[in-house]
C-alpha cells in the first residue's frame, strides 16, 4: 500500500512539473546562451487582472508580468508572470 502511495505522489509531482500553466524560456543574449532560465506563469486573463505587472510583483514574482496572447487562435490576452 505504501509503495502505491509513493508512486501516486511521484506521478502527481511529475504532472505538476509538466503542467500547461508553466513555460520555460531562456533569458539573456539573442542566441539564448546566457544559461539563466526564466519561467513564465499564466496568472489569468488580463481583462480580470487589469494591472498585470503590479499583480505579479505583489504575489512574489519580482520580475513582474505582462499581457500576451498565448496562441494565435486565442481570443483574449493572458497575464503572464516571470520568475527565475
UniProtKB/Swiss-Prot annotation:
It is found in: Secreted. Residues 1-24 form the signal peptide. Keywords: Antimicrobial, Disulfide bond, Fungicide, Plant defense, Secreted, Signal. Disulfide bonds join 46-67, 52-79, 56-81. It comes from the Eukaryota. The keyword Zinc does not apply. InterPro entries: Scorpion_toxin-like_sf. One of its GO terms (cellular component) is extracellular region. One of its GO terms (biological process) is killing of cells of another organism. Belongs to the DEFL family. This is Defensin-like protein 37. It comes from Arabidopsis thaliana.
